[in-house]
Amino acid sequence: MSAVLKSPADSAIADISLAEWGRKEIRIAETEMPGLMAIREEFAAKQPLKGARITGSLHMTIQTAVLIETLKALGADVRWASCNIFSTQDHAAAAIAATGTPVFAIKGETLVDYWDYTHRIFDFGPKGSEGEGPNMILDDGGDATLLMHLGKRAEKDASVLANPGSEEERILFAAIKAKLAEDSTWYSRKSAQIIGVTEETTTGVHRLKEMSAKGTLMFRAINVNDSVTKSKFDNLYGCRESLVDGIKRATDVMIAGKVAVVCGYGDVGKGSAQALRALSAQVWVTEIDPINALQAAMEGFKVVTMEWAADKADIFVTTTGNRDVITFEHMKAMKDQAIVCNIGHFDNEIQVAKLEEHCQWEEIKPQVDHVIFPDGKRIILLAKGRLVNLGCGTGHPSFVMSNSFANQTIAQIELFTHPEGYDVGKVYVLPKHLDEKVARLHLKKVGAMLTELSDEQAAYIGVPKQGPYKPDTYRY
């Protein structure tokens, strides 16, 4: 296969010869993704996404390849980039590019490349044509959505690009300035037909809600992250398996007997803490929320502060979606050879920029660095502070991603086929009956048998016999 394949012109991938390997792994993943395969079977004949032009910004993994091919099977035209510079699996990108779908994703790409690729996934047709840009966005972390909003604002007011707050912002702002110098209405045209966005993760949802509250969100949005079958499965059970896989692949460290600090005890933090404890680490948790802190304490975790724990622990994991969770001062206090990593979306959970400014770096292998302080002490930083499970491992298992991506696919169908049911500028979650549908699609694979209510039982507790079974306020 590799002897006859040529890298497509409308793609940017590492090596097209990896396509056959990628295709073999995609076939295996399909057997572990019953939700997506059932959706293909249910909707393929109806083609509900025919006419959809989907700009996708989400980790270009084997599991994402199954999502992309599901969207295409339902009629969509798709262009794709990774939402993280380290998370691409190059064989997955090659396999999708080999089918003719434009893919812009290379593991270890530069930030300059990243923003170039994020621009290129909006180029569906010639300038001025009806299908020039997308009519849907599928986002993870909100960068594709951010690009449209910030670029359109900059068309009218260049001062919004005047004061970047970080190196990544400097590169983003430079990319927007370059695009505007080339085409002064590019962002307005590309965003003109966008019906809505479906957002995968906590960080991106936060951005959407912020824009919605300010009245600046330009299109409809569905918050996929807060579907129960996403947040309580991907965030919890996915991280429970992929965190330690990433740490182990990167360091080969013995986790048993170590002291590990998990910063944050939301769903991601809960899964991370459980995983480390399962390997017999002594796990401590930091929290800002008294409810989450009490949950951690009731599960037997010691609840501490970073200031108290910095010089005592061996492994540190950030899970919060916030900034400056592990500071330069914390890292100065750490033991020699302490391991520091992040499983939240962005690298600013750890003050990596200050490490770059004040310390020497020595690459041990890709995505594993010794950071050397002036006194000679070294810490091991994984994935340069970006997602450790995808930077140093292969991310979540296929089965749990089937839950998340089934939600994404259903959300895309909902927004594209029923836009009148969703107001521009507002953020929605999928209704409970669709959440329950996603769960049903996965029960057979794990050998689960569902008990059915009798008519009398349903009437007694006041729910429909076929669901939904819980009020929207139920926490699971």
Swiss-Prot record:
Listed GO MF terms: adenosylhomocysteinase activity
Cellular component per GO, a single term: cytosol
Subcellular location: Cytoplasm
UniProt pathway annotation: Amino-acid biosynthesis; L-homocysteine biosynthesis; L-homocysteine from S-adenosyl-L-homocysteine: step 1/1
Free-text cofactor note: Binds 1 NAD(+) per subunit.
Binding site for NAD(+): 201-203, 235, 264-269, 287, 322, 343-345, 389
InterPro entries the UniProt entry points to: Adenosylhomocyst_ase-like_sf (IPR042172), Adenosylhomocysteinase-like (IPR000043), Ado_hCys_hydrolase_NAD-bd (IPR015878), NAD(P)-bd_dom_sf (IPR036291), S-Ado-L-homoCys_hydrolase_CS (IPR020082)
Predominant cellular place of this UniProt entry's protein: cytoplasm
GO biological process: L-homocysteine biosynthetic process; one-carbon metabolic process; S-adenosylmethionine cycle
Family note: Belongs to the adenosylhomocysteinase family.
Name of this chain's protein: Adenosylhomocysteinase
